[in-house]
Amino acid sequence: MGIHGLAKLIADQAPGAIKEQEMKNFFGRKIAIDASMCIYQFLIAVRQDGNVLQNEDGETTSHLMGMFYRTIRMLENGIKPVYVFDGKPPQLKSGELEKRGERRAEAEKLLAQAQEAGEQENIDKFSKRLVKVTRQHNDECKKLLTLMGVPYVEAPCEAEASCAALVKAGKVFATATEDMDGLTFGTGVLLRHLTASEAKKLPIQEFHFSRILQDIGLSHEQFIDLCILLGCDYCGTIKGIGPKRAMDLIRQHGSIEEILDNIDLSKHPVPEDWLYKEARGLFLTPDVVDCSCLELKWSEPDEEGLVQFMCAEKQFSEDRMRNGCKKILKSRQGSTQGRLDSFFSVTGSLSSKRKEPEMKGSTKKKLKTGATAGKFKKGK
């Protein structure tokens, strides 16, 4: 879900913090990509006659086709992508996940009605609402990325939080996702539409977090409180407080606690057992991948492995797979003259513990590494 209305609010209040870019402008950049968001996009967009692509066994293959070609497109533009997969969702997200389940159940009813009435437009609409990224989708994409020579990371919790940690640690330049909560987790740069279909011709939006805070006059903690007021995945919101009012209240009072002391709670009731403090803590000190022990390597594709997996098992065209491998190899040759930051290597080990930066008091947190030895092929 992300943060309700945040993109528009930033566009209104801090337009100078947003740049419109073309993909070629990120040549030589390492970019952490929210994998689940990408796979969801592919399942929605990569279709034939309104239906997801399938192989002869009836297995969905839209996610694989999307992942293969969109990744190649980035590589051809000199980008070094690293995909970050979600881990276990935080307990605070259970309410949001329950709501999503209710919306799916409603969509199933509406789909059945549309099918009975033969309303193709509604059939397409409600079918897309039922799209869900499964563990099998994730596992197949991880296998594909390994065969393509592209690294991936398994986050211990929310992918966007670990993407932000990679940016903060200087391992990558930006987080690529459609959800704005990457900014709430503190990513220095957030990119939207990087993995969108080329046919849509959407410019890539580049958000700069420090400029956002500067232009709206808030600290990171105040920005987090603003996002909670707008609406996030982890708790409810105060009734009757829209985006502009939320911004005004945070600027005036500085925190949710002070706002609650200064508004009419009979007109603006708060949710029962409102867990805004817990949500704030999750944004400030999330469970993230240990960047100090992470090794990211981009290597040559395993052409025969790709043909076996994508052609023999998934029934893709062998010619297209081999042509794709040629494009990957060519992109590797072209990317040797990259940006200065591409010449620095990252070293790591299998597991470790680290402390989150101290933000309020001294909070110690055990963190799990998202990289294991089998997930990255050795580069030349």
Swiss-Prot record:
Mg(2+) 1 binds at D34, D86, E158, E160. It comes from Osmerus mordax (Rainbow smelt). Phosphorylated. Phosphorylation upon DNA damage induces relocalization to the nuclear plasma. Belongs to the XPG/RAD2 endonuclease family. FEN1 subfamily. The keyword Cell inner membrane does not apply. Its cofactor is Mg(2+). One of its GO terms (molecular function) is manganese ion binding. Residues 122-253 are annotated as: I-domain. Residues 348-380 are annotated as: Disordered. This is Flap endonuclease 1. Residues 336-344 are annotated as: Interaction with PCNA. It comes from the Eukaryota. Keywords: DNA damage, DNA repair, DNA replication, Endonuclease, Exonuclease, Hydrolase, Magnesium, Metal-binding, Mitochondrion, Nuclease, Nucleus, Phosphoprotein. The keyword Phosphoprotein applies. The gene is fen1. Structure-specific nuclease with 5'-flap endonuclease and 5'-3' exonuclease activities involved in DNA replication and repair. During DNA replication, cleaves the 5'-overhanging flap structure that is generated by displacement synthesis when DNA polymerase encounters the 5'-end of a downstream Okazaki fragment. It enters the flap from the 5'-end and then tracks to cleave the flap base, leaving a nick for ligation. Also involved in the long patch base excision repair (LP-BER) pathway, by cleaving within the apurinic/apyrimidinic (AP) site-terminated flap. Binds 2 magnesium ions per subunit. They probably participate in the reaction catalyzed by the enzyme. May bind an additional third magnesium ion after substrate binding. It is an enzyme of class 3 (hydrolase). Interacts with PCNA. Three molecules of fen1 bind to one PCNA trimer with each molecule binding to one PCNA monomer. PCNA stimulates the nuclease activity without altering cleavage specificity. It is found in: Nucleus, Nucleolus; Nucleus, Nucleoplasm; Mitochondrion. PROSITE patterns: XPG_1, XPG_2. DNA binds at R47, R70, E158, G231, D233.
